[in-house]
């Protein structure tokens, strides 16, 4: 408990922690060596002053050191959002992940249950019949079988149990809202990352560069969504081979129509699962368009599309010819088969 005091004392002066100090602080937190009072004070000191890149990188290093790792193809990617945008849209990144996988890109999706919305990635996938909470071997088997796999934060970041109560009691965003997407258990180097605030796009790009990412698009809708949005412009900060650049995209760039924000609202896991399945069954809707836009952006990140219009064409084709629906079916089957105790390691067909 005493080891946290010097670090808290430094934060109390308004000073920032070095990367090494941040790693030390989060090591203590993840070991359960911080009292509830110390943890709450630490998180709010960072929040009020504003987390630095060194503090984020140091925190991620501590998370990555403890996570249950997953072996994935070198070209695997993640499509994920920070959450916390307050709009409770349906599960755009989850559907985009299925579409992108259907286009031949391995997707190792990392996610959680809902925090600020009614339905997080774990919630909607469970409603669709996907087995959640698989261990590393089971995830690897499903990734090989279906081309997509889901890694739950609870299963792969057990150390987070030490902060769950404090986060719930604080009831506000903390550094943990942005750490999860930076600590993918499969160590992916390619990401489409939705961010809840425009001000975080550049800092997170710099953090991901320091953490070794190859190509990432960080996106924030001008309407506030932590997705590429179809209601208007989306702000993008792209990291590619160490270079960072900022630009905007619009739905028209992908040949898509604009939508009203109300048309993108989600609901319960059952509601969102039904909406997702309707898109996979070919129903034209604003839900389909925003999923296509995000899939198109992800396909650019994956090196499979030269621009949004080509990416949108590939994504739409994967829906219309049934490949995306087939990908979901394969994931449901593979995840349930992989979790059977009698199945030998690596035998998920």
From Swiss-Prot:
The organism's place on the tree of life at top rank: Bacteria
Keyword Repeat: no
Binding site for Mg(2+) 1: 93, 227
Binding-site list for Mg(2+) 2: 226-227
Cofactor info, note text: Binds 2 magnesium ions per monomer.
Residues the entry annotates as binding anthranilate 2: 167
InterPro entries on file: Anthranilate_Pribosyl_Tfrase (IPR005940), Glycosyl_Trfase_fam3 (IPR000312), Glycosyl_Trfase_fam3_N_dom (IPR017459), Glycosyl_Trfase_fam3_N_dom_sf (IPR036320), Nuc_phospho_transferase (IPR035902)
Name of the top EC class for this enzyme: transferase
Cofactor(s) essential for the protein: Mg(2+)
Signal peptide: none
EC number(s) on file: 2.4.2.18
Assembly with partners or alone: Homodimer.
Family membership noted in the UniProt record: Belongs to the anthranilate phosphoribosyltransferase family.
PANTHER family: ANTHRANILATE PHOSPHORIBOSYLTRANSFERASE
Protein name: Anthranilate phosphoribosyltransferase
Gene source species: Methylocella silvestris (strain DSM 15510 / CIP 108128 / LMG 27833 / NCIMB 13906 / BL2)
Gene: trpD
